Every structure is written in C-alpha cells, then in structure tokens.
C-alpha cells in the first residue's frame, strides 16, 4: 500500500512546517485532524481545503472540500463544496507538487499550504499517520 508524504506550511510563516506521512485512502476529515494535531491545535473548528492558493481568493476555488458539506442535516447552507468525510486524499492529490490551501477556523483564518512531496511504500513497522518532521515552533492557537 502506498503512503503520501506532505509538507504543510503556515501560509504567512512559511519557515514553520510539518511533514506528514499518511495513507492516500484516508479521508480529508482524518487528514485535517492530523494537520491540526501536528501544530498542537485543538480540532474544534470548521475547515476546508481549496485549490486556489492565493490566500484571499480561496472561496473562488474550482475545487473545494469543506466540513460544511457534511453538515447539511444540521441546517447548514450548501457552499458548493464537496464532502471532507467522503473524499479521500488520493482523490485530491494525484502528482508530486500538487498543492491545496487548508483553512482551519473560519474566525481566526489559520491558513496552510499542503503540498504533496512524495510517495512511499507502507512500512509494517510504522504506525500511520506519522509526523515525519517538524521545523519551527508552532504558534499558539489562541492568544489568551
């Protein structure tokens, strides 16, 4: 089974990054939780993945996946986005160099670039997902 290696950088502080290895069969919901955890944030807000990387035009993305798409039964208005619970990593990232913008917390707007940097074969001795590398100190999620 193939694993995907990602480099995730804070959008406005690119020197802070995490490398994560995860199965391509994992959902975007699962991946979002791993990204947030790698930065020591609480996984307690809505989020989305967007193909428009510019930072301020992400809602104009051709491809977008949001938690809101999975909350229709809770009275959330459709945003035109696809499901994060039903979409797999392998459905979104196909080639090394593919990037998406990850937005966590629509109030505080934590933005990350998520780039596929490689593929590996599963190692039975490793538990996945795995944080492969941490560079830089993660900022505090809340300035209390």
Stretch-by-stretch model annotation:
Residues 1-144:
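Short linear regulatory motifs enriched in tryptophan with gly/pro/ser
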